[in-house]
């Protein structure tokens, strides 16, 4: 039993059902109980986010319900979903990067079957304003919508 499982028994146990990359991200955020440290972690993710192609920034790829401008594109490569994204706000860019790192390389079915419970497990809802927390959820739902389109054999937006 590791130290985290002693401190956060329910949260770490829940991570066992998450895809490995997403579970690692959740555990990183669980290590930081200080909201400022979580913000710093988000900003770090945002800085690591690869630039998004400008042609992907179209209405079909815009996440609705976000105060910031947020765009998500998805491609299906060898049966795995690969996302790209961007935001005009650094903190939200970190949320986008967190989700991209956690979900890239999964099958559409794996993404669709995920519940948003992992968002709460990160502890970020304590650190984020209600509108940003809602935006985080909306970004995740947009990514799932694109995965559903792949399941149905359709493209969703451009990319």
Curated annotation (Swiss-Prot):
Q: Which domain of life is it from?
A: Bacteria
Looking at the Swiss-Prot or TrEMBL record, what is one Pfam family this protein matches? SufE
Under the heading SUPFAM superfamilies, the entry gives:
SufE/NifU (SSF82649)
Task: List, alphabetically, the InterPro entries matched.
Answer: Fe-S_metab-assoc_dom
Protein family (similarity comment): Belongs to the SufE family.
What protein name is recorded for this chain?
Uncharacterized SufE-like protein slr1419
Native source organism of the sequence: Synechocystis sp. (strain ATCC 27184 / PCC 6803 / Kazusa)
């Amino acid at each position: 039993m590791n130290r985290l499982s002693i401190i956060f028994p329910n949260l770490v146990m829940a991570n066992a059902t998450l895809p490995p990359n997403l579970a690692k991200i959740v555990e990183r955020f669980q290590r930081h109980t200080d909201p400022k440290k979580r913000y710093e972690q988000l900003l770090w993710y945002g800085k690591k986010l690869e630039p998004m192609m400008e042609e992907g920034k179209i209405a079909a790829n815009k996440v609705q319900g976000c105060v910031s401008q947020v765009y998500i594109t998805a491609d299906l490569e060898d049966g795995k979903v690969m996302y790209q994204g961007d935001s005009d706000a650094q903190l939200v860019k970190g949320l986008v990067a967190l989700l991209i790192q956690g979900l890239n390389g999964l099958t559409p079915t794996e993404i669709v079957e995920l519940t948003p419970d992992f968002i709460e497990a990160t502890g970020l809802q304590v650190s984020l304003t209600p509108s940003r927390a809602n935006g985080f959820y909306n970004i995740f739902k947009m990514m799932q919508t694109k995965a559903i389109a792949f399941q149905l054999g359709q493209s969703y937006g451009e990319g």
